[in-house]
Amino acid sequence: MATAGRRGGAASERRERRESRRQEASPEKSNFLERVVTINRVAKVVKGGRRFSFTALVVVGDGNGMVGVGYGKAREVPAAIAKGVEEAKKHFFTVPRVQGTIPHPVIGEAAAGVVLLRPASPGTGVIAGGPVRAVLECAGVRDVLSKSLGSDNAVNIVHATVKALRALVPPEKVAVRRGLPLEEVAPPALLRAKAEAGV
């Protein structure tokens, strides 16, 4: 009986902590886009049987060039998602964009997942499957072509997409590295935008 009482007390404490974390995080929810890519139930075999918990892969971004991916694990789905969101916010990085698309084609690989991303003209939209689309939309990429060339495992695809986005290099940096004027390496869309802005 004492053991059951301790378990009940611990469970109520966990619920209170979850509620407090949820209340603290709620004001920030409007500032970020959150996409739950996959939720998986896992089991750990212990002396008394199997103990179930949930894992959640979450993508968080500001829709304006910042994105991160997090992995959360907890006894309940909402808590796993909340942990994933916090983990994603710790791993934010900046995605170079040119007129709503990416500056150049790129391939990202993670385990057996391989993702190809290519720039697209304005109005094309995000041509991508679920996991890739979640990352690109949270990053604020509006026009892009993509193709998954490897595993269809959502976790691998998401991490491959993140690696591809991290490998992008802004045209300005390419010009400096090569010692060339920006006009020779930048996409025409960027040059037109700079001309219209008078930069």
Curated annotation (Swiss-Prot):
Transmembrane segments: none annotated. Residues 32-95 form the S5 DRBM domain. Keywords: Ribonucleoprotein, Ribosomal protein, RNA-binding, rRNA-binding. Residues 12-27 have a biased composition (Basic and acidic residues). Residues 1-29 are annotated as: Disordered. The N-terminal domain interacts with the head of the 30S subunit; the C-terminal domain interacts with the body and contacts protein S4. The interaction surface between S4 and S5 is involved in control of translational fidelity. With S4 and S12 plays an important role in translational accuracy. Located at the back of the 30S subunit body where it stabilizes the conformation of the head with respect to the body. NCBIfam families: rpsE_bact. This is Small ribosomal subunit protein uS5.
